[in-house]
């Protein structure tokens, strides 16, 4: 086995750094932002194939504040982080939760949205008869009483067929908290909803910011939300912009722009427009 002479290596590195001079902040003129394109109302395509939604509107607003020209591109969810780290685009705005596992790989802006998670089933499902004593459940600060209530609630899912989008915090939560439940994973949330309505699965789990607009639609009266509204834990710290770890200057630009968009009510206005309620973080 070979060993490095650490003193010699340190001297070489120091010399290289001195020769290179101080690090210069990157001057961003234009960036490319990836989004999934199939997660309404965050990001989806209109009849003409144009990307629209909350993420798109907010992203364009942030880019104006940063004085940067931005281009949105569509990227399948399962490859969205690997393609960022590979340099195929500069940022991600795709309803992506700021979660510990993801933070090991990429950096995030400050949260631009806060939304709890809850369950979805059909209007005729016996699951709706379940009584739960907890309406809001912060998983980072769960009390013994809340944990007992959650355990009692999750027991109703024995024998229930669950469907969730693959690679999401919803899948991670189900596998950790309900390992005995039968879980099917899907490439898009739209396919989850389609199978739920067709009776191929019994329930799902997603964000309220996705589920409320979904269940408010007249043609989705057969779908109902139920159960506690959960935050924190595996669901993370909110929704943020995904950025490469080495692009700290870009993160700083997004953080400043998001602060301003929250302060002047833009995030609140857009969340009311797209989700039907205020999901903006507080300053």
From Swiss-Prot:
The UniProt entry, under InterPro entries, shows: Iontro_rcpt_C, Lys_Arg_Orn-bd, SBP_3_CS, Solute-binding_3/MltF_N
Keyword terms, alphabetized: Disulfide bond, Periplasm, Plasmid, Signal, Transport
- Residue pairs linked by disulfide bridges in the UniProt entry: 63-70
Subcellular localization is given as: Periplasm
Tell me where it mainly resides: periplasm
**What family does this belong to?**
Belongs to the bacterial solute-binding protein 3 family.
What is the name attached to this protein's record? Nopaline-binding periplasmic protein
Native species: Agrobacterium fabrum (strain C58 / ATCC 33970) (Agrobacterium tumefaciens (strain C58))
The gene it comes from is: nocT
